[in-house]
From Swiss-Prot:
TM annotation in the entry: none
Protein name in the entry: NADH-quinone oxidoreductase subunit D
GO cellular component: plasma membrane
UniProt xrefs under PANTHER family: NADH DEHYDROGENASE [UBIQUINONE] IRON-SULFUR PROTEIN 2, MITOCHONDRIAL, NADH-UBIQUINONE OXIDOREDUCTASE 49 KDA SUBUNIT
A GO molecular-function descriptor: NAD binding
Organism per entry: Desulfitobacterium hafniense (strain Y51)
Localization, UniProt: Cell membrane
Biological role stated in the UniProt entry: NDH-1 shuttles electrons from NADH, via FMN and iron-sulfur (Fe-S) centers, to quinones in the respiratory chain. The immediate electron acceptor for the enzyme in this species is believed to be a menaquinone. Couples the redox reaction to proton translocation (for every two electrons transferred, four hydrogen ions are translocated across the cytoplasmic membrane), and thus conserves the redox energy in a proton gradient.
Subunit description: NDH-1 is composed of 14 different subunits. Subunits NuoB, C, D, E, F, and G constitute the peripheral sector of the complex.
UniProt KW keywords: Cell membrane, Membrane, NAD, Quinone, Translocase, Transport
Family from the record: Belongs to the complex I 49 kDa subunit family.
SUPFAM superfamilies: HydB/Nqo4-like
Protein backbone atom coordinates (compact mmCIF):
# COMPACT_ATOMS: atom_id res chain seq x y z
CA UNK A 1 0.00 0.00 0.00
CA UNK A 2 2.85 2.40 0.83
CA UNK A 3 4.43 1.72 -2.59
CA UNK A 4 1.19 2.61 -4.31
CA UNK A 5 0.99 5.83 -2.31
CA UNK A 6 4.54 6.84 -3.17
CA UNK A 7 3.99 6.14 -6.85
CA UNK A 8 0.94 8.37 -6.82
CA UNK A 9 2.58 11.46 -5.28
CA UNK A 10 4.20 14.12 -7.40
CA UNK A 11 5.57 17.60 -6.90
CA UNK A 12 3.04 20.37 -7.38
CA UNK A 13 3.92 23.87 -8.59
CA UNK A 14 1.60 26.47 -7.09
CA UNK A 15 1.51 30.11 -8.18
CA UNK A 16 0.63 32.47 -5.32
CA UNK A 17 0.04 36.02 -6.47
CA UNK A 18 0.45 38.57 -7.82
CA UNK A 19 -3.25 39.15 -7.07
CA UNK A 20 -3.43 36.96 -3.99
CA UNK A 21 -4.84 38.97 -1.02
CA UNK A 22 -2.15 37.64 1.32
CA UNK A 23 0.75 38.84 -0.86
CA UNK A 24 0.58 42.39 0.58
CA UNK A 25 0.90 43.89 -2.87
CA UNK A 26 1.73 42.63 -6.34
CA UNK A 27 4.15 39.92 -5.23
CA UNK A 28 4.27 36.40 -6.67
CA UNK A 29 5.70 33.21 -5.25
CA UNK A 30 6.17 30.00 -7.22
CA UNK A 31 5.80 27.42 -4.46
CA UNK A 32 6.89 23.79 -4.80
CA UNK A 33 4.75 21.40 -2.78
CA UNK A 34 4.99 17.77 -1.79
CA UNK A 35 1.52 17.16 -0.46
CA UNK A 36 0.95 20.17 1.80
CA UNK A 37 4.63 20.61 2.65
CA UNK A 38 6.60 23.43 1.02
CA UNK A 39 9.79 22.14 -0.64
CA UNK A 40 10.87 25.29 -2.46
CA UNK A 41 9.94 28.94 -3.00
CA UNK A 42 10.88 31.14 -5.94
CA UNK A 43 10.03 34.82 -5.32
CA UNK A 44 8.97 36.85 -8.37
CA UNK A 45 9.23 40.61 -7.98
CA UNK A 46 9.15 43.68 -10.22
CA UNK A 47 5.41 44.07 -10.84
CA UNK A 48 5.50 47.51 -9.18
CA UNK A 49 8.87 48.64 -10.55
CA UNK A 50 8.77 52.31 -11.52
CA UNK A 51 12.47 53.05 -12.00
CA UNK A 52 12.74 55.47 -9.10
CA UNK A 53 16.53 55.45 -9.06
CA UNK A 54 16.64 56.48 -12.73
CA UNK A 55 13.89 59.06 -12.24
CA UNK A 56 16.04 60.70 -9.54
CA UNK A 57 18.72 61.50 -12.13
CA UNK A 58 16.30 63.73 -14.07
CA UNK A 59 14.86 65.57 -11.05
CA UNK A 60 16.35 68.26 -8.86
CA UNK A 61 17.11 67.28 -5.28
CA UNK A 62 13.88 68.81 -3.82
CA UNK A 63 11.75 67.48 -6.69
CA UNK A 64 12.61 63.88 -5.78
CA UNK A 65 11.23 64.12 -2.22
CA UNK A 66 7.61 63.23 -3.19
CA UNK A 67 8.87 60.16 -5.07
CA UNK A 68 10.36 58.80 -1.85
CA UNK A 69 6.85 58.75 -0.34
CA UNK A 70 6.09 55.92 -2.76
CA UNK A 71 8.74 53.55 -1.40
CA UNK A 72 7.32 52.28 1.89
CA UNK A 73 4.05 54.12 1.44
CA UNK A 74 2.85 52.94 4.88
CA UNK A 75 5.63 54.94 6.57
CA UNK A 76 6.38 57.75 4.13
CA UNK A 77 8.01 60.15 6.67
CA UNK A 78 10.85 57.62 7.10
CA UNK A 79 11.54 57.64 3.36
CA UNK A 80 11.52 61.44 3.32
CA UNK A 81 13.82 61.55 6.33
CA UNK A 82 16.36 59.12 4.90
CA UNK A 83 16.58 61.04 1.63
CA UNK A 84 16.73 64.60 2.96
CA UNK A 85 19.27 63.66 5.63
CA UNK A 86 21.46 62.12 2.92
CA UNK A 87 21.39 65.37 0.93
CA UNK A 88 21.96 67.42 4.10
CA UNK A 89 24.96 65.24 4.95
CA UNK A 90 26.39 65.92 1.50
CA UNK A 91 25.82 69.68 1.92
CA UNK A 92 26.97 69.87 5.54
CA UNK A 93 23.67 71.50 6.58
CA UNK A 94 22.80 72.12 10.23
CA UNK A 95 19.09 71.62 10.98
CA UNK A 96 17.14 73.81 13.46
CA UNK A 97 16.40 72.12 16.79
CA UNK A 98 12.62 72.40 16.48
CA UNK A 99 12.69 70.80 13.04
CA UNK A 100 14.75 67.88 14.41
CA UNK A 101 12.15 67.21 17.12
CA UNK A 102 9.25 67.46 14.67
CA UNK A 103 11.01 64.95 12.42
CA UNK A 104 11.35 62.50 15.30
CA UNK A 105 7.66 62.86 16.22
CA UNK A 106 6.54 62.28 12.63
CA UNK A 107 8.90 59.35 12.11
CA UNK A 108 7.84 57.53 15.28
CA UNK A 109 4.15 58.13 14.55
CA UNK A 110 4.78 56.58 11.13
CA UNK A 111 6.54 53.60 12.74
CA UNK A 112 3.57 53.09 15.05
CA UNK A 113 1.08 53.34 12.17
CA UNK A 114 3.12 50.95 10.03
CA UNK A 115 3.15 48.36 12.81
CA UNK A 116 -0.61 48.81 13.24
CA UNK A 117 -1.08 47.86 9.58
CA UNK A 118 1.26 44.91 10.11
CA UNK A 119 -0.74 43.60 13.09
CA UNK A 120 -4.04 43.99 11.26
CA UNK A 121 -2.90 42.37 8.01
CA UNK A 122 -0.98 39.54 9.72
CA UNK A 123 -4.09 38.72 11.75
CA UNK A 124 -6.29 38.87 8.66
CA UNK A 125 -3.98 36.44 6.85
CA UNK A 126 -4.98 33.90 9.51
CA UNK A 127 -8.68 34.87 9.24
CA UNK A 128 -8.57 37.07 12.34
CA UNK A 129 -11.24 39.53 11.28
CA UNK A 130 -11.71 41.03 14.74
CA UNK A 131 -7.99 41.62 15.27
CA UNK A 132 -7.90 43.30 11.86
CA UNK A 133 -10.42 45.99 12.71
CA UNK A 134 -9.01 47.44 15.93
CA UNK A 135 -5.56 48.60 14.70
CA UNK A 136 -7.06 50.16 11.57
CA UNK A 137 -9.59 52.02 13.70
CA UNK A 138 -6.86 53.62 15.81
CA UNK A 139 -4.49 54.23 12.90
CA UNK A 140 -6.97 56.81 11.64
CA UNK A 141 -5.91 59.05 14.53
CA UNK A 142 -2.32 59.07 13.27
CA UNK A 143 -3.48 59.79 9.73
CA UNK A 144 -5.52 62.69 11.14
CA UNK A 145 -2.33 64.05 12.74
CA UNK A 146 -0.47 63.73 9.44
CA UNK A 147 -3.30 65.56 7.70
CA UNK A 148 -3.13 68.41 10.22
CA UNK A 149 0.60 68.68 9.66
CA UNK A 150 0.86 68.33 5.89
CA UNK A 151 -2.61 68.15 4.33
CA UNK A 152 -2.02 64.53 3.31
CA UNK A 153 -2.80 61.30 5.12
CA UNK A 154 -0.65 58.64 3.44
CA UNK A 155 2.07 60.09 1.20
CA UNK A 156 2.81 62.79 3.72
CA UNK A 157 5.72 64.60 1.97
CA UNK A 158 6.45 66.51 5.18
CA UNK A 159 10.26 66.74 5.13
CA UNK A 160 12.32 69.34 3.33
CA UNK A 161 16.05 69.68 2.72
CA UNK A 162 16.89 71.81 5.74
CA UNK A 163 13.86 71.11 7.94
CA UNK A 164 10.15 70.31 7.72
CA UNK A 165 7.39 71.60 5.46
CA UNK A 166 5.18 73.40 8.00
CA UNK A 167 4.59 74.26 11.62
CA UNK A 168 1.90 72.03 13.19
CA UNK A 169 -1.40 73.85 13.83
CA UNK A 170 -2.55 74.54 17.39
CA UNK A 171 -4.98 71.59 17.42
CA UNK A 172 -2.16 69.15 16.57
CA UNK A 173 -0.69 69.08 20.08
CA UNK A 174 -3.88 68.27 22.08
CA UNK A 175 -4.75 65.55 19.54
CA UNK A 176 -1.25 64.09 19.89
CA UNK A 177 -1.42 64.15 23.71
CA UNK A 178 -4.80 62.39 23.61
CA UNK A 179 -3.35 59.75 21.28
CA UNK A 180 -0.38 59.13 23.59
CA UNK A 181 -2.69 58.78 26.60
CA UNK A 182 -5.00 56.27 24.91
CA UNK A 183 -2.58 54.02 23.04
CA UNK A 184 -1.09 51.90 25.88
CA UNK A 185 -4.56 50.53 26.64
CA UNK A 186 -5.26 50.01 22.93
CA UNK A 187 -1.99 48.11 22.50
CA UNK A 188 -2.98 45.76 25.30
CA UNK A 189 -6.31 45.30 23.53
CA UNK A 190 -4.60 44.34 20.24
CA UNK A 191 -2.32 41.94 22.09
CA UNK A 192 -5.12 40.13 23.90
CA UNK A 193 -7.25 39.76 20.77
CA UNK A 194 -4.44 38.68 18.44
CA UNK A 195 -1.34 37.37 20.22
CA UNK A 196 -3.37 35.96 23.10
CA UNK A 197 -5.45 33.84 20.74
CA UNK A 198 -4.64 30.13 21.07
CA UNK A 199 -5.15 29.44 17.37
CA UNK A 200 -2.80 32.28 16.39
CA UNK A 201 -0.19 31.02 18.85
CA UNK A 202 -0.41 27.47 17.49
CA UNK A 203 0.09 28.71 13.94
CA UNK A 204 3.04 30.97 14.77
CA UNK A 205 5.11 29.40 17.56
CA UNK A 206 8.08 27.31 16.37
CA UNK A 207 7.07 28.04 12.77
CA UNK A 208 9.11 29.96 10.19
CA UNK A 209 12.43 29.66 12.02
CA UNK A 210 15.08 32.23 11.03
CA UNK A 211 18.23 31.55 13.04
CA UNK A 212 20.58 34.28 14.21
CA UNK A 213 23.40 33.01 11.99
CA UNK A 214 21.25 32.94 8.84
CA UNK A 215 19.76 36.38 9.59
CA UNK A 216 23.24 37.88 9.93
CA UNK A 217 24.59 36.12 6.84
CA UNK A 218 21.68 37.36 4.72
CA UNK A 219 21.98 40.94 6.07
CA UNK A 220 18.42 40.88 7.42
CA UNK A 221 17.53 44.09 9.27
CA UNK A 222 14.68 45.55 11.29
CA UNK A 223 12.22 43.62 13.48
CA UNK A 224 12.99 40.34 11.67
CA UNK A 225 16.63 40.58 12.76
CA UNK A 226 15.84 41.59 16.34
CA UNK A 227 13.38 38.69 16.67
CA UNK A 228 16.29 36.38 15.81
CA UNK A 229 18.37 37.42 18.80
CA UNK A 230 20.39 40.31 17.32
CA UNK A 231 19.98 43.58 19.24
CA UNK A 232 20.73 45.92 16.36
CA UNK A 233 18.95 49.17 15.54
CA UNK A 234 20.44 52.01 13.48
CA UNK A 235 18.95 54.54 15.91
CA UNK A 236 21.28 53.15 18.59
CA UNK A 237 24.18 51.76 16.52
CA UNK A 238 24.65 54.91 14.44
CA UNK A 239 22.25 57.59 15.78
CA UNK A 240 20.98 60.02 13.16
CA UNK A 241 19.24 63.33 13.75
CA UNK A 242 18.87 63.68 17.53
CA UNK A 243 18.02 60.07 18.42
CA UNK A 244 21.00 59.97 20.78
CA UNK A 245 19.11 62.34 23.12
CA UNK A 246 16.24 59.93 23.74
CA UNK A 247 15.93 57.23 26.35
CA UNK A 248 14.55 54.08 24.73
CA UNK A 249 15.34 50.38 24.53
CA UNK A 250 15.99 48.20 21.50
CA UNK A 251 13.70 45.15 22.01
CA UNK A 252 15.21 41.77 21.22
CA UNK A 253 13.72 38.25 21.25
CA UNK A 254 15.32 34.86 20.81
CA UNK A 255 12.54 32.57 19.55
CA UNK A 256 13.48 33.23 15.89
CA UNK A 257 9.95 32.25 14.81
CA UNK A 258 6.85 33.86 13.32
CA UNK A 259 5.42 34.50 16.79
CA UNK A 260 8.45 36.51 17.91
CA UNK A 261 8.51 38.49 14.67
CA UNK A 262 4.95 39.55 15.53
CA UNK A 263 5.62 40.13 19.22
CA UNK A 264 8.69 42.31 18.62
CA UNK A 265 6.52 44.89 16.88
CA UNK A 266 4.30 45.29 19.94
CA UNK A 267 7.42 45.97 21.98
CA UNK A 268 8.67 48.50 19.42
CA UNK A 269 5.35 50.35 19.45
CA UNK A 270 5.70 50.91 23.20
CA UNK A 271 9.20 52.31 22.63
CA UNK A 272 7.88 54.63 19.91
CA UNK A 273 5.32 56.04 22.34
CA UNK A 274 8.12 56.61 24.83
CA UNK A 275 10.20 58.52 22.26
CA UNK A 276 7.27 60.69 21.15
CA UNK A 277 6.45 61.63 24.76
CA UNK A 278 10.04 62.76 25.32
CA UNK A 279 10.01 64.75 22.07
CA UNK A 280 6.74 66.50 22.97
CA UNK A 281 8.15 67.34 26.41
CA UNK A 282 11.48 68.71 25.17
CA UNK A 283 10.67 70.35 21.83
CA UNK A 284 11.98 73.94 21.79
CA UNK A 285 10.58 77.01 20.08
CA UNK A 286 12.34 78.31 17.00
CA UNK A 287 12.52 78.06 13.22
CA UNK A 288 11.61 74.88 11.35
CA UNK A 289 13.83 75.46 8.29
CA UNK A 290 17.53 76.13 7.88
CA UNK A 291 18.70 78.77 5.44
CA UNK A 292 19.15 76.90 2.18
CA UNK A 293 19.70 78.29 -1.32
CA UNK A 294 16.72 78.36 -3.68
CA UNK A 295 18.63 76.14 -6.10
CA UNK A 296 20.27 73.30 -4.21
CA UNK A 297 23.61 72.23 -5.69
CA UNK A 298 25.53 69.99 -3.26
CA UNK A 299 29.30 69.88 -3.81
CA UNK A 300 30.62 67.11 -6.04
CA UNK A 301 31.10 63.91 -4.08
CA UNK A 302 29.32 60.85 -2.80
CA UNK A 303 27.52 60.01 0.42
CA UNK A 304 25.63 57.13 2.04
CA UNK A 305 23.14 57.53 4.87
CA UNK A 306 20.80 55.02 6.53
CA UNK A 307 17.84 55.10 8.89
CA UNK A 308 15.82 52.52 10.83
CA UNK A 309 12.69 52.07 8.76
CA UNK A 310 9.76 50.04 10.23
CA UNK A 311 10.54 47.30 7.67
CA UNK A 312 14.33 47.34 8.10
CA UNK A 313 17.33 49.48 7.27
CA UNK A 314 16.67 52.06 4.54
CA UNK A 315 19.71 53.68 2.96
CA UNK A 316 20.39 56.22 0.21
CA UNK A 317 23.64 56.43 -1.72
CA UNK A 318 23.94 59.66 -3.73
CA UNK A 319 26.65 60.71 -6.17
CA UNK A 320 26.71 64.46 -6.82
CA UNK A 321 28.42 66.15 -9.75
CA UNK A 322 27.87 69.66 -8.37
CA UNK A 323 24.73 70.34 -10.43
CA UNK A 324 21.09 70.69 -9.24
CA UNK A 325 20.45 67.04 -10.22
CA UNK A 326 22.19 63.96 -8.80
CA UNK A 327 24.38 61.86 -11.06
CA UNK A 328 23.35 58.62 -9.36
CA UNK A 329 20.94 57.57 -6.60
CA UNK A 330 20.96 54.05 -5.14
CA UNK A 331 18.30 52.95 -2.66
CA UNK A 332 18.97 50.19 -0.15
CA UNK A 333 15.48 48.93 0.75
CA UNK A 334 15.17 46.80 3.88
CA UNK A 335 12.07 44.94 2.68
CA UNK A 336 13.86 43.94 -0.55
CA UNK A 337 16.86 42.48 1.29
CA UNK A 338 14.67 40.74 3.87
CA UNK A 339 12.90 38.73 1.16
CA UNK A 340 16.11 36.71 0.79
CA UNK A 341 15.12 34.65 3.82
CA UNK A 342 11.83 33.45 2.32
CA UNK A 343 13.15 29.94 1.63
CA UNK A 344 14.69 29.77 5.11
CA UNK A 345 11.41 30.47 6.88
CA UNK A 346 9.09 28.75 4.38
CA UNK A 347 10.65 25.49 3.24
CA UNK A 348 9.59 22.57 5.43
CA UNK A 349 6.42 24.25 6.68
CA UNK A 350 2.85 23.60 5.55
CA UNK A 351 1.39 25.78 2.83
CA UNK A 352 -1.05 27.39 5.28
CA UNK A 353 1.84 28.33 7.59
CA UNK A 354 3.76 29.91 4.72
CA UNK A 355 1.18 32.71 4.59
CA UNK A 356 1.78 33.66 8.25
CA UNK A 357 5.55 33.33 7.90
CA UNK A 358 5.65 35.57 4.84
CA UNK A 359 3.41 38.12 6.57
CA UNK A 360 5.86 38.25 9.50
CA UNK A 361 8.48 39.84 7.20
CA UNK A 362 6.13 42.81 6.59
CA UNK A 363 7.27 43.35 3.00
CA UNK A 364 5.84 46.38 1.21
CA UNK A 365 6.16 46.08 -2.54
CA UNK A 366 6.64 49.78 -3.19
CA UNK A 367 9.93 49.50 -1.34
CA UNK A 368 10.83 46.08 -2.78
CA UNK A 369 10.30 46.98 -6.44
CA UNK A 370 11.25 50.69 -6.33
Amino acid sequence: MSDLYNEGTEELLLNMGPQHPSMHGVFRMVVRLQGETVTGIEPKIGYLHRGLEKIAESRTYPQFIPYTDRLDYLASPHNNLAYVQTVEKLMGLEIPERAEYLRIILAELARFASHQVFIASAALDMAGWTAWGYPFRDRERILDLFEMMSGSRLTVNCMRIGGVSAEPPAEFWPALESFLDDMPEKLEEYFNIYMGNEIAQARMKKVGILSKEVAENLCITGPALRASGVQYDVRKAEPYGIYDRFDFEVPVLYGCDTYDRNLIRFMEMNESLKIIRQAVRDIPEGPIMAKVPKIIKPPAGEVYHRVENPKGELGFYIVSNGTPKPERVKIRAGAFVNLQCLNEIGVGTYIQDLIASFASLDAVLGEVDK
